[in-house]
């Protein structure tokens, strides 16, 4: 090949190489943020649409019911994940090993200290209370303590999902902290003796059991009431919901047990600045209001009101235990559930 052609080929090859490199640089990434979400699409897509409209940043989402933390671990430094959205303090605590600390004054300002990690690796987005669903016809009490549920008057009247489910383990961990191990174990044995049957089903199944008169009191998260009340695909759930009232049992030091949905920034987030912008947006008044309307949960911000439907379920004082404390005690609470044979039923 003539020298001038060789020179041209080298220049062309270099140009193509630089061009391909340019296409894989963060130019496009700077206009997007990648979210791995355990939360269902209909819950978060209105938020992402509003964020994109406001900022021009495209939100790309991977939805899954399980395995996202493990996926991020497996992807390692090449992971495209920027933000993880999940529910329950157990999952948020587990996400710390794939997360990085975020020092953002906006997050510190609007998220209570008890609802974010002391290491700044996870942040609550919404509150959900774990409550008693009680039969309107067969239960007169509209105020209860969790301690009351071990009283003999409730023998054969309580229904519950598996004691090992993360929602119950979080509740039990909180009560373990409140009561101390000896009294908590005694209480759990009393609750076990009051079960109407072996723990089974999900939270809504407990309400169905109350409707069917299989029990009088069930334990569940508040937002399931909203899901049942508005369920057009399974309208029979509206009848279940109509059969019960929500009662907010208090913990021994006072206050209803609370858990959260939340977020974390992935350790190797390729779009860190955009990830932080999204996280900050999700605690804005606009986003908190959208979230509250869509998912029947309580805003993490104290200056944003719950939706009218959620507010109609009643007022309560939340427990002030730090969720980090609940996370720390989850393992021991789970062990005690096994040691007492709780899941074997009464």
How would you describe each model-predicted region?
Residues 30-94:
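Early extracytoplasmic/lumenal segment of secretory-pathway proteins
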Residues 133-138, 258-271, 290-293:
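A bilobed periplasmic-binding-protein/Venus flytrap-type ligand-binding module shared by bacterial periplasmic
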Residues 36-39, 118, 134-136, 141, ...:
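Short beta-strand->loop
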Residues 123, 139-154:
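Flexible hinge/capping segments at coil-to-helix
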Residues 157-164, 281-302:
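Periplasmic-binding protein-like
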Residues 182-184, 296-346:
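An extracytoplasmic/periplasmic, membrane-proximal ligand-sensing/linker region
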Residues 174, 178-249:
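Ligand-binding pocket segment of bilobal, Venus flytrap-like solute-binding proteins
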Residues 79-84, 100-132, 147, 158-160:
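A structural signal for short loop-to-beta-strand junctions that line the ligand-binding cleft
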